[in-house]
């Protein structure tokens, strides 16, 4: 079973980094309503588009998701 996207993303946190994956990880870490237990692209993507309390470039999210799948 694959780790949840959130669990993987938290391994990418680097608060002083300007790398998009680190930025997203820090934003998600602060977001208490992020879906933490899913590995569904549809669920996470929909959350980022419609529900997140922050905005993030979804093209960058697609690239980050590909990195997640590769791990």
From Swiss-Prot:
Family annotation (InterPro entries): UPF0346 (IPR010673), YozE_SAM-like (IPR023089), YozE_SAM-like_sf (IPR036806)
Gene3D superfamilies in alphabetical order: YozE SAM-like
One Pfam family linked to the record: YozE_SAM_like
Family named by the database record: Belongs to the UPF0346 family.
Protein's UniProt name: UPF0346 protein SMU_1621c
């Amino acid at each position: 079973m694959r780790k949840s996207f959130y669990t993987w993303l938290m391994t990418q946190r680097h608060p002083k980094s300007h790398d998009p994956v680190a930025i997203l990880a820090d934003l998600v870490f602060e977001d208490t309503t992020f879906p933490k237990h899913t590995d569904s692209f549809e669920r996470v993507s929909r959350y980022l588009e419609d529900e997140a309390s922050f905005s993030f470039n979804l093209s960058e999210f697609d690239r980050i998701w590909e990195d997640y799948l590769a791990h």
